[in-house]
Amino acid sequence: MNIQALLSEKVSQALIAAGAPADCEPQVRQSAKAQFGDYQANGVMAIAKKLGMPPRQFAEQALAHLDLTGIAAKTEIAGPGFINIFLDPAFLAKNIEAAVASDRAGVEKVSAPQTIVVDYSAPNVAKEMHVGHVRSTIIGDASVRTLEFLGHKVIRANHVGDWGTQFGMLIAYLEKQQQENAGEMALSDLEGFYREAKKHYDEDEAFAERARSYVVKLQGGDEYCREMWRKLVDITMTQNQITYQRLNVTLTRDDVMGESLYNPMLPGIVADLKAKGLAVESEGATVVFLDEFKNKEGEPMGVIIQKKDGGYLYTTTDIACAKYRYETLHADRVLYYIDSRQHQHLMQAWTIVRKAGYVPESVPLEHHMFGMMLGKDGKPFKTRAGGTIKLSELLDEALDRARRLVAGKNPDMPADELEKLANAVGIGAVKYADLSKSRTTDYIFDWDNMLAFEGNTAPYMQYAYTRVLSVFRKAGVKESELTAPVVIQDDREAQLAARLLQFEETLGVVARDGTPHVMCAYLYDLAGLFSGFYEHCPILTAETDALRQSRLKLALLTAKTLKLGLDTLGIETVERM
C-alpha cells in the first residue's frame, strides 16, 4: 500500500481540474507534525505562481475538485496554500487489516520491474579487506536487498581489482622466493609478499623490469602467469567470502566481475573511439578531450585511455564496464557504490560512454557516493600505530564486545544461544551504525554509541522487536486466532497505523536514492510510536476482547514491519534478548 502515490494521483487530478497544467507536481509529502495532518500537498504555490493566481484562492479551487471519499476524514488549507490531509480511521483500519494478512506487511511488488546492476564492495586481490571496504559493502547490500524485495531483478557486480602491475610484482617476487604454489598460502602471507614485492619494485630496477614483463605476459595469456594469477584471485576471494558471510552480506563468488573481465574489450573500445573522432593521439598516448571538464588553464581536459606503452587505464576499463552492463547484462539502471573521491573519474568515463553511444541516456548511471569512516578524533579510522584496520579484526572486536554486553544481561543463557545473540548484536551494531547515517557524510565510529541499548542503534531496534514479540507470548494467542476486525479509535492507534502503512513509501525512497538511513529513521520512529501506543493503549488488559484483538493486530504488524525492514538492511533479528 503506497498512500503517498494514491494521494499524489488524487491531488494531481484536482489540480488539473482547477486549471493546472497536465504535468503539474502535487508534491505530496508526509507531514512533519500531527497538527498538519498525515500528509501535505505543497505544490499549490508553485502552480499558482505560474497561473498568476493567489495561492490560497487556487488551493480553494483545487480543494473543491479533490475527492478523497473513504480516504481522508478531512482536508484543510494551511498557511499560504498548503493542503493538509487527515486520513480516515476507517481507511487506516481497512489497510492495516490487509497488511496483517500479507506476509510482506502490505508491500506490493513494483508493476514494472527493472534489471538493475549494483556495483559494490570491490576489494583488491592479494590484499585483505579493511575498514575502507565497509561502507560500499554494507550500503550496497542494503540497496540490493531493498530492490529485490520490491521485485526488481538485481545483478550484483563485485568489481574486484584483479588486474594491473601489482600482479607482475607478486608473480616476480613469488618466483624469486620459489613460492610457486600460491594456493597453500594464507592471505596474511600474501599481504607480506605484497609489501616485499613493492619494496623490491621501488628499489630494484631489474626486478621492476621483470615485474613489468610479467604484466605483459599475463595480458598476453602466458599460461604460467595466468595460473599464478588465478591462484592469487582464488585465495583472496575465498577469504573475502568468509568476511561476507560474517557480515550477513549477500555477495557470492558468482557475483565477482573483476577488472580482468573487460580486458578483451579494451582494444576495440580504443579503436572505436578513434573511429568516432572522440579519441586522438597526443604525445604518443590516446586521449579523449572533454569540453565538459576544464583543466587549470580553462582548456578541455584530456582523459588518457591508452598510454604510450600500449597499457590501458582505469577509465578505459570503466568505459568497457558500462558498455558491458548495458549490452550484455541488459541493465535498465546501474548503481555504483564507490567513494566520493572517484566522482570526477566516473563522470569522465560516463561522459565518454554517452558520447560514444554505448549506453543511452534512458539508462541511468548513478554514482551513490559515500563519505569516510572516522575515528573519535575526527581523522580516518586507523589502528593506534596509524595502520589500516583489517575488517576481520574489526568484526572480531565487535563480537567480543557484544559477547560481554549480552552475557552481562543474560548470565544464565546457554553458551550456543549467547554466541548467536552476540553475533547478531555485534555485527548488527557495526552495520547499523553505518547504515543509520546519511551515506554522503563522514561519520564517527564509536563502539559505545553503536552498542548502546538507547537511541537509533541496532541493539535498541533488535530489543524493540523482541519487546513486541513478548506481548504476543504473554497474550498466548496465534495469529490465526485474531478474527476480530481492526478498529482505530485512539490518536496513538491512528499514528501507529499511519506510520505502519508508510513502509512501502519508505522502501521506495531507499530504492530510488540508495539511502538506507531513511529506513533506519523510519524503523526507529516506528519503534517509538509503538512504545507510546503500548503505554497508553492497554493491549492485554483492553476493555473488550475485540479491542484486545485489534490492538494485537497492530502489534503483530509492527513486529512484521520491524523484521522486514531490518532484513532489507541486512540486520538479523532475534527472538529474545
From Swiss-Prot:
Domain of life, per lineage: Bacteria
GO terms (BP aspect): arginyl-tRNA aminoacylation
InterPro entries referenced in this protein's UniProt entry, alphabetically: aa-tRNA-synth_I_CS, Arg-tRNA-ligase, Arg-tRNA-synth_N, Arg-tRNA-synth_N_sf, ArgRS_core, DALR_anticod-bd, Rossmann-like_a/b/a_fold, tRNAsynth_Ia_anticodon-bd
Localization in the cell: Cytoplasm
Xref: CDD domains: Anticodon_Ia_Arg, ArgRS_core
GO cellular component term, pick one: cytoplasm
UniProt catalytic activity: tRNA(Arg) + L-arginine + ATP = L-arginyl-tRNA(Arg) + AMP + diphosphate
Chain location of the short sequence motif 'HIGH' region per the record: 123-133
Entry EC no(s): 6.1.1.19
Keywords, in A-Z order: Aminoacyl-tRNA synthetase, ATP-binding, Cytoplasm, Ligase, Nucleotide-binding, Protein biosynthesis
Top EC class for this record: ligase
Keyword Membrane included in the entry's annotation: no
A single MF term (Gene Ontology): arginine-tRNA ligase activity
PANTHER family in alphabetical order: ARGININE--TRNA LIGASE, CYTOPLASMIC, ARGINYL-TRNA SYNTHETASE
Subunit structure and binding partners: Monomer.
Family in the record: Belongs to the class-I aminoacyl-tRNA synthetase family.
Official protein name in the record: Arginine--tRNA ligase
Species: Cronobacter sakazakii (strain ATCC BAA-894) (Enterobacter sakazakii)
Record gene name: argS
